[in-house]
Amino acid sequence: MFLPASVPPMLARARVVFRGRVQGVYFRANCQQKADELGIRGFVRNRQDGLVEAVFEGEKAVVEACIEWNTSRQPHARVDRSDVTWEDPTGEFVEFEVRH
């Protein structure tokens, strides 16, 4: 039986809106640090309505881990809810950035 030497990772893209106490608590900086540690590309930004929006692109399991960390382990934030929308990955990002 033939098995490929390596199976490419399943790439994913998630757009996440974080709700709760998420602005003014270093959420974006911590999000960027975690995404960089995990090798995820995309961005995070504050929205005018007081929410934080992020787009994560990378290996699906790693993206899921990053969403979980940002939802439940952000040091100073309180995330009441995270709304996740899965999208087709585009490969448009070269790094993870904080947008202003």
Functional labels for PLM-detected ranges:
Residues 1-100:
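Intrinsically disordered, low-complexity, mixed-charge
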